[in-house]
């Protein structure tokens, strides 16, 4: 009985196995009919599966991998969308020529962007792209290339990057090529920066005075001295004779003049504030005499000048005054603000529209001063005075000093001018932050200097210190950066140039007095060493001329000497042959008199 049951079980098992093999073979045949690229498997009678089927598909498709197998629910949609419906009865592979034609037809499909967007709307979208992004878009398709190489886009890029600001769109026919020509000298100047290859000039000093303050704008330098004199240089032309800007007090009282406390300059105006509270404003285009004079009752503690508009802000005692001309061109007091403490730092916010906006720090108070409005407190924490200040078009950055371990060290606070709230708290250093630069820094980056002798590069997106450089022997007094380098000045008189991408110091120069001012552009650098003491020191009591080492220094570095050599020779090369002054500069010049 048991043998009979066992035999019956074996027979049923063999029938089920045979039936399952028939079903499996039928399914494979149906699948082979649905896919016309691999019909040989059904013709051979043994369907290929797994890795064997993949290899056969690669061989039959001439190196092209087989398309993924569609699901059961998508097979009807795929067959309905195909360009040529598959022949279920065909058993031969598709010719390679037909496959090539079908692939070319698929490449002719136009992207959605090209079909549905008008050309004018595409231009408006592409105007927010930079040079690199436009180059990438030109590689997408022919239509995108036409849009990405539109002359209007490259004309706007050329203007945004500061090239040919006074040119019109009709002046050139290929603005992309013009931008390439404008950028070519920049790539040639960078090696000169890295190797300190160029010309250095020490601006002529007033012999009987000590340097008090220095500022510059687009190569034009202004300096004030203890003798009350204000001098202007144009470093863009080597043969420029620096004039003195005269004041009305010199004509009234020809004796000892008050010290110059602050000087400021922009493209058209020069401003100087004196120790006795006098403020003079000169128009650089009209003459050497001031066009406006304003007098405070007390000493001027801070001075600011807008770089775009004729707007001047001064702080004296507990008052902050904004001055600018009216519609007739007459200067007047436009706004006056009262603050609770003496002002330490004062800056005018750029690009504010009709009404100018200023930022003032007074002890532990930071004020937002808008013309035609009252003073508003932007920041206040008792016992945390501000130690430095800088502003950009949308943000203000200032260092705060922490008194005690509770506040976790000194920081730099970044505020939004539009929202009037704190965006970032950066730093956490033991020393006081002595300088910060957000106006000239690349987007989302900021550089600062500290009394702990370190220069810090801050990433505003992460609120972290991206780089920290041990730059100076004493505290850092001035700092500025661009897209690849940092230039810093220290209290010991050292000017250092860093390539922060490689975390490497390129070169440095040293002078006697602290570095109080640094400004550079793509091809030039201006530094000023201002002494601590403003008193004349000389061993000869009968001679009031100040010794050279106590005056202070202003240096102008030019790294595009090859370009300037065709415009005018250097001053040392214009000396006559019978003088020996040309050999006292310790410069390795080859044939300095060949240009005569």
UniProtKB/Swiss-Prot annotation:
Residues 44-64 have a biased composition (Low complexity). GO terms for biological process: cell population proliferation; cilium assembly; Golgi organization; labyrinthine layer blood vessel development; negative regulation of insulin receptor signaling pathway; positive regulation of dendrite morphogenesis; positive regulation of proteasomal ubiquitin-dependent protein catabolic process; proteasome-mediated ubiquitin-dependent protein catabolic process. SMART domains: FBOX (SM00256), WD40 (SM00320). Expressed in placenta and embryonic brain (at protein level). InterPro entries: F-box-like_dom_sf, F-box_dom, WD40/YVTN_repeat-like_dom_sf, WD40_repeat_dom_sf, WD40_rpt, WDR55_POC1. The modification N-acetylmethionine is found at residue 1. GO terms for molecular function: ubiquitin-like ligase-substrate adaptor activity. This is F-box/WD repeat-containing protein 8. It comes from Rattus norvegicus. The gene is Fbxw8.
């Amino acid at each position: 009985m048991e043998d009979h049951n066992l035999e019956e079980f074996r027979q049923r098992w063999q029938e089920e196995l045979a039936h399952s093999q028939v079903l499996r073979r039928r399914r494979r045949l149906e699948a082979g009919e649905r896919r016309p690229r691999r019909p040989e498997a059904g013709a051979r009678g043994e369907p290929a599966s797994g890795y064997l089927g993949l290899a056969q598909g690669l061989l039959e498709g001439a190196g092209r991998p087989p398309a993924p197998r569609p699901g059961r629910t998508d097979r009807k949609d795929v067959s309905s969308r195909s360009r040529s419906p598959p022949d279920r009865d065909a058993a031969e592979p598709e010719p390679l020529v037909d496959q090539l034609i079908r692939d070319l037809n698929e490449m002719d499909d136009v992207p959605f962007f090209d079909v549905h967007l008008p050309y004018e709307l595409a231009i408006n979208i592409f105007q927010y792209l930079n040079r690199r992004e436009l180059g990438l878009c030109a590689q997408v398709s022919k239509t995108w290339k036409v849009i990405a190489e539109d002359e209007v886009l490259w004309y706007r890029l050329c203007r945004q990057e500061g090239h040919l600001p006074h040119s019109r769109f009709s002046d050139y026919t290929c603005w992309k090529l013009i931008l390439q020509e404008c950028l070519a000298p920049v790539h040639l100047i960078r090696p000169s920066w890295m190797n300190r290859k160029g010309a250095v000039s020490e601006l002529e000093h007033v012999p009987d005075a000590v340097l008090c303050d220095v500022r510059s704008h687009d190569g034009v330098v202004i300096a004030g001295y203890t003798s009350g004199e204000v001098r202007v240089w144009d470093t863009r032309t080597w043969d420029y004779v620096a004039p003195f800007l005269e004041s009305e007090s010199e004509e009234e009282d020809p004796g000892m003049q008050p010290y110059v406390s602050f000087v400021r300059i922009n493209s058209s105006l020069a401003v100087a504030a004196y120790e006795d509270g006098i403020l003079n404003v000169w128009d650089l285009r009209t003459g050497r005499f001031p066009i406006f004079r304003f007098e405070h009752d007390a000493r001027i503690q801070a001075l600011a000048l807008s770089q775009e508009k004729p707007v001047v802000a001064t702080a004296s005692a507990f008052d902050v005054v904004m001055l600018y001309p009216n519609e007739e061109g007459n200067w007047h007091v436009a706004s006056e603000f009262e603050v609770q403490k003496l002002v330490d730092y004062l800056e005018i916010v750029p690009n504010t529209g009709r009404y100018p906006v200023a930022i003032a720090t007074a002890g532990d108070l930071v004020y937002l001063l808008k013309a035609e409005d009252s003073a508003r407190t932007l920041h206040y924490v008792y016992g945390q005075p501000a130690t430095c200040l800088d502003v950009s078009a949308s943000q203000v950055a200032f260092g705060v000093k922490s008194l005690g371990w509770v506040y976790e060290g000194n920081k730099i606070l970044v505020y939004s001018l539009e929202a009037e709230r704190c965006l970032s708290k950066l730093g956490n250093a033991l020393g006081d932050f002595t300088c910060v630069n957000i106006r000239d820094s690349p987007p989302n980056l900021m550089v600062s200097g500290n009394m702990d002798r370190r220069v810090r590069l801050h990433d505003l997106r992460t609120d972290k210190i991206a780089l920290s450089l041990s730059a100076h022997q004493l505290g850092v007094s001035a700092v500025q950066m661009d897209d690849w380098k940092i230039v810093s000045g220290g209290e010991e008189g050292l000017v250092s140039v860093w390539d922060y991408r490689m975390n490497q110091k390129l070169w440095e120069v040293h002078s006697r007095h602290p570095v109080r001012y640094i400004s550079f552009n793509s091809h030039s650098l201006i530094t000023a060493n201002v002494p601590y003491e403003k008193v004349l020191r000389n061993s000869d009591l009968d001679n009031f001329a100040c010794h050279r080492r106590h005056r202070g220094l202003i240096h102008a570095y030019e790294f595009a000497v090859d370009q300037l050599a065709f415009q005018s020779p250097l001053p040392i090369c214009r000396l006559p042959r019978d003088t020996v002054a040309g050999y006292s500069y310790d410069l390795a010049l080859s044939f300095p008199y060949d240009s005569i």
